[in-house]
């Protein structure tokens, strides 16, 4: 009996917790007992205000997709066990300072997709000292009060993309425990040297799809722990020489979809642990020697979608590039300067799809199919730049009238009245394929018409000759 009695004693607290969870469940919600307490689901319930009471044991409350507009002070009462609170896709326009008081253990707060929530008071998140994740996605925020996040010393992750920020919020500075910051798809125009001060634990920063035109020197100076930096799809045309200096733990750097015209050797000098480098969809025409020399651990380099005609092996020396290289959608000139790349493609199998744009003799071929000839002294010979001429087997178009053709036509008209119809036809046809002298009629003695014709032609020829020069 002892094992049976013991099992009843163990199950009794669970039963009591389930009963308490169901007993205090709001009418429009569903509640269930979970390992950490009580889960309350009020999503899509058509609520226009916060329920007056929640189970005291509530560990998670979901109020997504309702019609909530305002959160008053202590909007949720006192819930000592609450760890997860979600208010996404509502119509929140104002949150009273102190609305989240009474939630001492709250670790995740999701306020995403409240498009009317355009302003937050500096004391909005007061008393949330345990908060680790804050989601402010798509809230139409123009700015964040500088002291707003200072009340959140434990904050690890901030999601604030799809907002209207024009600069990196000053509120981020000094968040010593922040590890992830999502600021993509906004209107941020620059990363200033003071934007990221004090973020010594930051491991992931996303600024993609903003309007960033400038990254100031030293902007990432305090971010030595950064592992993933996304700056793709912005308006960057240039970077400072030591743009990423000190980021020795960086593993992913995405600079794709910008307006960069060159790749400098100083940009990546400190990135010895970099694994993924995206430089695709830029306007790059030149890569400096040694630009990738320290990237010996690189798994993939994306240079596709640029304006590269040549890529020197010196860009990778003295390091040794081991990863995959993506080079498609570039106007490659497949001459001897790319012979090393052709050999590498054959030997490693880690480079593919390098279509040639020139010289003409290999245009349209993939570089892997180009055969480089050798001179007598063993040097590489560039493929020929062919000059094609057009040949058509069809009859040529009617030529432009010349002096001879005009003269022949005039002569035919002069002689036509004195010849039978059949002779005129034959004479006109023959003029196109004979010399001028052969085209003149045979003039016998005493033929007055012929003499008059010659006199006329004597005065006419100089005029026709001058006109022919102009044509």
Where are these regions (language model features)?
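LRR N-terminal entry segment and analogous cap-like coil->beta motifs
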Residues: 34-75, 79-82, 88
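The feature encodes a structural signal of leucine-rich repeats
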Residues: 47-52, 72-74, 96-98, 120-123, ...
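Leucine-rich repeat
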Residues: 48, 54-57, 69, 77-81, 93, 101-106, 114, 117-118, ...
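Solenoidal tandem-repeat scaffolds enriched in leucines and small polar residues
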Residues: 115-238
